[in-house]
Amino acid sequence: ANGEGTYVNYASVCTGEGNYKEAVAVAYDEDLVSLTVLLDVFFHCIDPSQYQRQMDDIGRQYQTGVYYLQDGEKIHTYMDSVRDNYDAFYVECEPLRVFYTAEQYHQSYLQKHPDGYCHIPLKVMRYVQDLNRSLQKLNSTSVD
């Protein structure tokens, strides 16, 4: 996301060419989950104090950020509210300028490679899974 240049693939992103960041596109229904919950989950998955890296992944393509199409003011307000919790804070927050979908072999990567590397700690993945189950239960309960 948010680099320069017209041809992008995983190999070029890994070299730092074009200054692209590895990113995930998130579409959501505000009636099912709030933006705040999504941002809370995001901050459970990253270390905002790391510059151009996340855990063992090092390089500018690993710079954390939130690149948005809408709700910029809400996102900036959230970022401002958590920034003081960290000695250093390197999370980019800016409008999405460009996004390229990764090659097919990167889609659903952990489903295809259950033992594949992921920097997100298992306890955080379980937290998100539990949260997702709770939200699904809550949303399937109709209130008349």
Which residue ranges define each predicted feature?
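Flexible coil/turn and secondary-structure edge motifs
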Residues: 1-144
